[in-house]
Amino acid sequence: AVREFLKWCGEEYVFCTWGNQDVMELQRNMKYYGMLSLLPGPVTYYDVQKIYGICHEEAGGRRSLEFAIDQMGIPKAQDFHRALTDARYTGDIFKTLEPAAVCVNSSIDVYQNPKNKKEEIFISYPTYDQYVSREFADKEKVMKDREVASTRCPVCHMPAKRRIRWFMNNSRAYESVSFCQK
């Protein structure tokens, strides 16, 4: 089924999801069936829930799909939490979003991390920067790499001063809080 789906997608496609779990689950299933090579990663996609929050919520919060449908006045013709119905509703919300907000707010799923320095990803979003580094064998090697451990202001791109040291927010990502010295 996944081969047919990817064939249907064609060469130039982008995934749009409600939330940040679907692309990872797709890759997990593909790995289980020995097909992960059909979808090279890291995978760039549009998290419609995130973009909806940026456009319609003060703090860019994450709301349920049903909340967004209600807020946008889209008729509820079918039950939620069914794959095709949720996909249709997500598409309906996506159509209401400002194209400018969509274009600058892509997401990156890192189920498949970059394998070397050349594959690393740096993206500057309107309010923050994201750096997806290559894999490291252990934490000590990561923290000794000056480029990986550095932080920059997303506005002026100058080095930022760290206010809160690097910490792990889950089992796969480190974060820090820094501020611009300008």
Can you name each region flagged by the protein language model?
Residues 6-135:
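Metal-dependent phosphoesterase core characteristic of DEDDh/y 3'-5' exonuclease domains
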Residues 96-182:
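Acidic two-metal-ion nuclease catalytic site recognized across multiple nuclease folds
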